[in-house]
């Protein structure tokens, strides 16, 4: 498990999240969306599968088929959920 900062432009907020770095990116996005919606007491419009997770450091869009470990994202990593 690692702790990362996830910035979500829709809410203009950054969230600290504990993530299993071996979990697939698609599942990570789904879990993040669920947690953020609960924290904000709202529902995200659109389809969760259309969200993208990006690594701020490398300026990469992360492939849903891979995992955070594949991108060498570690504790303190900064991600962007759009």
Explain the meaning of each model-derived region.
Residues 1-82:
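Ubiquitin system architectures
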């Amino acid at each position: 498990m690692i702790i990362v900062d996830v910035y979500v432009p829709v809410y203009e907020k950054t969230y600290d999240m504990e993530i299993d770095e071996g979990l697939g990116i698609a599942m990570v996005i789904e879990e993040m969306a669920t947690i953020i919606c609960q924290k904000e007491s709202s529902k995200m419009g659109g389809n969760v599968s259309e969200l993208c997770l990006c690594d701020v450091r490398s300026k990469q869009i992360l492939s849903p088929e891979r995992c955070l470990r594949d991108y060498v994202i570690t504790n303190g990593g900064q991600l962007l959920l759009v």
